[in-house]
């Protein structure tokens, strides 16, 4: 097994990416931060994306938070997912920012959500709060694409949520909408407003929204992965 190495170039193919990710499994965040020469924050309250930034150093990711995937040349998106001692996800997973205007004629097939979730490298990370940040270990990664059933679940929720946005109902959408995909505000502060369509078709200002995968979607996905590892 390779030891963790900081990569400044993107992986040439999917297998190379998986091998880079596998080399991180079992290491804790303090060890990896030391190798990458990245300061370890006291906690993630002000540095929510820090783990992703750290792992990108070892994986050679390039896209950041752009609409394209993290590894555009090979069509793979990186998602870190905090898990508890049972391997269950501790929180929802951000997919992408939701477009609140200019949505006439938009389809699931051409959506950012579908594009981002077409091929995902999931990296589980210990996330229980009683474990100090530096001692949290990286889990075994998996590369995943949605099954037909999973894609259908995602499409149904996406279409329902987008219909509400287009019909000027964005402010009535709650986190309870959607079986596996939810829409909720994504802003560090409540002053960051963006334009949307109001109830009567008028322009309004509202908080930016993001699409998130619910734990009911990611939990069985991870459970299958960990079951395969133990067999």
From Swiss-Prot:
SMART domains cross-referenced by the UniProt entry: MutH
Gene Ontology biological-process entries: DNA modification; mismatch repair
Signal sequence, start to end: none
Compartments (UniProt record): Cytoplasm
Top-rank lineage group of the source organism: Bacteria
One GO cellular component, as annotated: cytoplasm
Function according to Swiss-Prot or TrEMBL: Sequence-specific endonuclease that cleaves unmethylated GATC sequences. It is involved in DNA mismatch repair.
Keywords linked to the UniProt accession: Cytoplasm, DNA damage, DNA repair, Endonuclease, Hydrolase, Nuclease
Protein family according to the UniProt entry: Belongs to the MutH family.
GO molecular function, one term: DNA binding
Record flagged with keyword DNA damage: yes
Pfam families on file: MutH
Name of the featured protein: DNA mismatch repair protein MutH
Principal place of residence: cytoplasm
């Amino acid at each position: 097994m390779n030891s963790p190495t900081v990569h400044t170039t993107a992986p040439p193919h999917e297998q190379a990416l998986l091998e880079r990710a596998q080399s991180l499994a079992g290491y804790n965040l303090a060890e990896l931060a030391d190798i990458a020469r990245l300061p370890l924050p006291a906690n993630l309250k002000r540095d929510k994306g820090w783990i992703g930034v750290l792992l990108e150093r070892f994986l050679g990711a390039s896209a950041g938070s752009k609409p394209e995937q993290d590894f555009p040349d090979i069509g793979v998106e990186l998602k870190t997912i905090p898990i508890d001692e049972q391997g269950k996800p501790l929180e929802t997973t951000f997919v992408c920012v939701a477009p609140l205007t200019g949505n006439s004629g938009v389809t699931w097939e051409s959506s950012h959500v579908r594009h981002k979730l077409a091929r995902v490298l999931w990296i589980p990370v210990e996330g229980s709060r009683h474990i100090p940040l530096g001692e949290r270990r990286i889990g075994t990664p998996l590369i995943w694409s949605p099954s037909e059933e999973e894609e259908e679940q995602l499409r149904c929720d996406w279409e329902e949520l987008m219909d509400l946005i287009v019909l000027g109902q964005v402010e009535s959408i709650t986190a309870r909408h959607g079986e596996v995909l939810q829409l909720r505000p994504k802003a560090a502060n409540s002053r960051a407003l963006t334009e949307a369509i109001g109830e009567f078709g008028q322009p309004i200002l509202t908080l930016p929204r993001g699409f998130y995968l619910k734990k009911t979607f990611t939990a069985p996905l991870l459970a299958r992965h960990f079951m395969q590892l133990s067999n």
